[in-house]
Amino acid sequence: MKVAVLGAAGGIGQALALLLKLQLPAGTDLSLYDIAPVTPGVAVDVSHIPTAVNVKGFSGEDPTPALEGADVVLISAGVARKPGMDRSDLFNINAGIVRGLIEKVAVTCPKACVGIITNPVNTTVAIAAEVLKKAGVYDKRKLFGVTTLDVLRSETFVAELKGLNVSRTSVPVIGGHSGVTILPLLSQVQYAKWNEDEIEPLTKRIQNAGTEVLNAKAGGGSATLSMAQAAARFARSLVKGLSGETVVECTYVEGDGKYARFFSQPVRLGKEGVEEILPIGPLSNFEQQALENMLPTLRADIELGEKFING
């Protein structure tokens, strides 16, 4: 099994490289790529950690050598948010970066499962889909927006608020990966009883958690470490699924289009990537209203990505 990280010299990428070296199954090949010349050095650095994961690093304009034979590709390349920016401000720079990398994926490893980390995910996943479609290699079972950080944050905040064991706390998060499109289904959390006045503030905290980190870092960075752990968890789940295990994760994929062309919800992962998109289950009145309110934003984000490729 080979996992490639594109954008491996960045704040998320370096932390992700470290976590994958520690967490991927023995015998996995880990391929690190970034345009920055430091990338082979990042690979040497993590290669000194004693685990049975083999690491190679590549830099320069062309990611092809890093992508050859990849089963899983994680894309974290691009610019990060700074204070005062929202994820859509990143669009103009990151859209072109994702397009260029996906064009290489389409040629070099068209059957790989691709996880998009680069923001704005609501839009960059649509860009990736349209590039793969133009190349004639799009398989909607193999393209994912990595929204796992919303799940991690929800699990953490719910466990803190309710005094639950965080390792046993599971919170499905549906919708998209920015602002109002992030919808944690708090009504589905086991062993948590909610007061009406808790739901809305907690939902807003989860939706704005990225900004919480931005402000706390006082202009010195965005949520890189928690994002890296979220991406590592998703990568591990993909690898398990590809190896024949049954794993369920919330992730942003193209489904039946009931809510939007791309939508994050629980997905059963398997040997072909998406094995089954699971139902979102019963919603509270608050969640139902929040879902209806987010859809115009989510659909507009997706359309922006489609138009970027198709004009």
From Swiss-Prot:
A cellular component annotation (GO) from this entry: cytoplasm
Binding locations of substrate: 81, 87, 119, 153
Record-listed NAD(+) binding positions: 7-13, 34, 94, 117-119, 227
Any Pfam family the entry gives: Ldh_1_N
Keywords: NAD, Oxidoreductase, Tricarboxylic acid cycle
List of catalytic residues: 177 (proton acceptor)
Annotated consequence of substituting residue 107 to T: In strain: a7205, BR355 and e6181
Reaction equation(s) it catalyzes: (S)-malate + NAD(+) = oxaloacetate + NADH + H(+)
Effect seen on changing residue 107 to I: In strain: 162, 375, 723, 788, 800, 1008, 1124, 1158, 1180, 1181, 1207, 1233, 1247, a6062, e6158, e6229, e7066, f6237 and 1209
UniProt-listed Enzyme Commission number(s): 1.1.1.37
Stated consequence of mutating residue 63 to L: In strain: 767 and 794
One Gene Ontology term of the molecular function aspect: L-malate dehydrogenase (NAD+) activity
SUPFAM superfamilies attached to this UniProt entry: LDH C-terminal domain-like, NAD(P)-binding Rossmann-fold domains
A single GO BP: tricarboxylic acid cycle
Assembly description: Homodimer.
Family: Belongs to the LDH/MDH superfamily. MDH type 1 family.
Biological role stated in the UniProt entry: Catalyzes the reversible oxidation of malate to oxaloacetate.
Protein name stated in the entry: Malate dehydrogenase
Lineage: Bacteria, Pseudomonadati, Pseudomonadota, Gammaproteobacteria, Pasteurellales
